[in-house]
């Protein structure tokens, strides 16, 4: 980002908030290309993912593209002519993808500068474990035990592209960039619809930025109302929702807002509320009554429908009572479990029995969904009975065994924090027997004859990896075997989930 700031200060674009001239600078394409090289493999730059590009950066393509952008009529190609029209050996879809990569990098600059200025003079705690998927579970174990209800909300996607453009209007003040972005976004989607049957090149950085800007606008309104809920009992609310792109819908929204929201906002005051967003969903945990949770539910529905023009059904907001219902969270089924404890106390000649109840977060493995995923990838049938993996029989024995061991180790690694390990045993059994059936099918033998010939040493490969990991946690090895499946272990080095089948 320091490189970007240096170039922006040189061009004077930062002071004037003009981003459009950067689309015609060759060094921005170079920086976007270099920035893509430093990303993870799953978010590589479009310059590397395009097979026609020969995995090399070409300044000639960039120069021709810039010349073509000066004549915008040459960028507009009818959908029926997309196959015939190519530019320097590439279709127009490739160039719209190049522009989308560049736009994502350029528009991130004001966001990064604003974020950096907000943290100036503050010391941020840097911890590798905070990036882990499992880092949230210790927080939930401490907080959810004091809550009664959880609101599970599915964040809707905007169905119209103009909504995304309007959201960016609040952040990007350059009208030329917004017009150019609108034009390229519509043309890019038209090209994508034309190539829908072909394997198109994904640009996760661009669409991730659009989604984050959409969610950022929603959360800014939600957090503002959450903090100011105690001051929203006055009859005038116009100042609270003043936005630069809100002209056409302002009267209709205030009519709905004034009629419905005063009674809602009057009951939204709750200092003990927690908000968590993950995988396109968000949960709202609080210690309140069902009436207040219903108020929050219809608040979300009205917010999405009236402010973002997104049809949002109330069925997408679920109210879960933690003591009775299970909450799907990061691949676990979480609920609160009551553990009764009886304590005997004796004072002089009198003894007392004190009944205590301890609330504990119970995280279970969703066995039905995991078996469904394994059945989809042909590890078992829909009933959970292991079958042979026919597509892997062409590989060597060591390769087949290593694949199954890796998958089993990843599942064990991720679901080791479950409170009950019975379902984990079943998943491991499916994978082990599937591995044996695959090897037996390759050697054209039965499972019984294959195991009799190789012995039990074949299945020991599934246990060695776990013993090596757990030895770091339990220094005394004789305790590791006894507490292997009775202790909940949250591994804080899981940053993202790989595809279990294609994980190499």
Curated annotation (Swiss-Prot):
Native source species: Arabidopsis halleri
Gene: matK
Protein name as annotated: Maturase K
Gene Ontology CC entries for this record: chloroplast
The entry's keywords: Chloroplast, mRNA processing, Plastid, RNA-binding, tRNA processing
GO biological process: mRNA processing; RNA splicing; tRNA processing
InterPro entries from the UniProt entry: Domain_X, Maturase_MatK, Maturase_MatK_N
Free-text function comment from the UniProt entry: Usually encoded in the trnK tRNA gene intron. Probably assists in splicing its own and other chloroplast group II introns.
Pfam families in alphabetical order: Intron_maturas2, MatK_N
Subcellular localization: Plastid, Chloroplast
Chief location category: plastid
GO MF annotation list: RNA binding
Coiled-coil blocks: none
Highest taxon listed in the record's lineage: Eukaryota
Organism lineage: Eukaryota, Viridiplantae, Streptophyta, Embryophyta, Tracheophyta
